[in-house]
Amino acid sequence: RRRPKGERQPTKAPNIPNRTSIPDRPAEADGKRFGDFEMDLIVDAYGHAILVLLERMTGFVMMEKLPYGKRAKPLSKTVVRMLYAYRKYLKTITTDNGSEFAAHLDITAGLRIKGLDDVTVYFADSYCSWQKGAVENINKLIRQYIPKKSNFNDFTDLYIKNVAKKLNLRPRKKLGFSNPKTEFFKQIANFALAS
């Protein structure tokens, strides 16, 4: 049968091997405990991408321009490099079903610490971006500095890092008007004291 003009073509379920769906994510990963991250890409019209990692409790954001675009293997190495210093605090990472996140098992392996539970990458349901709402909201704030129609090649790596720095120093109501950077490192200090 012919599809009426403007009606959406049904999409196939994402083909990401060994993916763990968001309903399997522990209830504690609700944004109230430290160490639960969300991950996303913002992409320009030219195929360039910026990786965005966000710690849910504190709103602490990390960003990096990806010179290889949306390729899964190099992206997984970048995620591991960016989170490696914080791996003992990691609990979960939630993302969408983009093929760029297909190497999620490489992320888990790269962040593994013997004797501790592995960090699991959970995948949101299709068309449910609200299931990773914290990173979607930060993406809107990022667009204040990097407008939608811009070419990411026009922005230096230093500029991207400075955008993250500005966002991490911006006071947030949910943090009692503290900022994400202060709260993120306060949580790390508390963890060190408890150890």
Task: State where each predicted segment sits.
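RNase H-like two-metal-ion nuclease catalytic core shared by retroviral integrases
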Residues: 95-97, 102-105, 111, 120-144, ...
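Short small-residue beta-strand/loop micro-motif enriched in glycine and branched aliphatics
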Residues: 60-64, 148
